[in-house]
Amino acid sequence: MFNLRYFPLIISLSFTVPIYAEDVEEIVVTALKRSSTVVDTPAAITAISSTEIEDKGITNMHDLKHLVPSMNFTSVLGAQNITIRGIGQFNGNPGVSVSTDGIFQSRAHSSQLGEMDLERVEVLRGPQGTLYGRNSIGGVVNLITKNPTQDMDGYVKLGYGEYDITTAEAAFGGGISDNTSFRLVVHGTEQGEGFYDCLNTGCGEQGYTDKQAFRLKIKSDLSDTVSADLMVASVETEGTPDPYGCLTDNR
């Protein structure tokens, strides 16, 4: 016998599922050196869009570890130590490759250049040596920054957080001519005079960090399919490292 009590539930599901599917954001990635959606990319990949970056307050690489499975992150004086699935190392040749706009960052400090004005973040887990070469046995982190456009736009961000950390970031860009545009972003971070005391005599407060960075991108469309891109970037970091070693015998 047909039970009418199940009929309203069937109707409800038939309308609810398509509506939910329409709200899913489709992210196009370039992790395989070509454009494809996350669903069509045959790799263990996590993609974070610019909308999610803004909504969740992602400002640096440290914030990514809360969104990417199997990823961990530590930092000493701005030097990034990334591990994916437990693979990674902290020296001049890390086990996880970091690229900014497709440019390999060979040193740990260099990855800070891609933390500003992000358009998208792509994290590939597992060995990626075939496409990305050395330093990618653990995986790859692709930082894609915003490109210049003909529309004039910009923003200013100010922040203050725990341990007396202050941040400031500003970006501005637009068209220079009919086929040339630019985008400039500057960033500064300062973390007080330190937030903990070193017990050894003479070392005082530790944990101070001071960082200034900028990036200028210029794009010229030579034709409908060819463009010339120029990027100039710099980052300078000062601070006190995390103290380690034997404590002074002050008994």
What is the role of each PLM region?
Residues 248-251:
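Surface-exposed loop/turn segments flanking beta-strands in extracellular/periplasmic regions
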Residues 153-155, 160-191, 195-242, 246:
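Transmembrane beta-barrel wall of Gram-negative outer-membrane proteins
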Residues 30, 62-103, 119:
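Extracytoplasmic beta-strand/coil segments of soluble accessory domains associated
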Residues 45, 53, 64-65, 121-126, ...:
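Non-catalytic regulatory/gating segments with a bias toward low-complexity or hydrophobic composition
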Residues 24-56, 80-81, 96, 121:
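N-terminal periplasmic "start-of-domain" segments of outer-membrane beta-barrel proteins
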Residues 101-127:
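Short acidic/polar hinge/loop motifs at secondary-structure boundaries
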Residues 61-64, 81-85, 99, 123, ...:
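N-terminal periplasmic accessory domains that precede
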Residues 1-22:
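Cleavable N-terminal targeting peptides that direct proteins into the secretory/outer-membrane pathway or into
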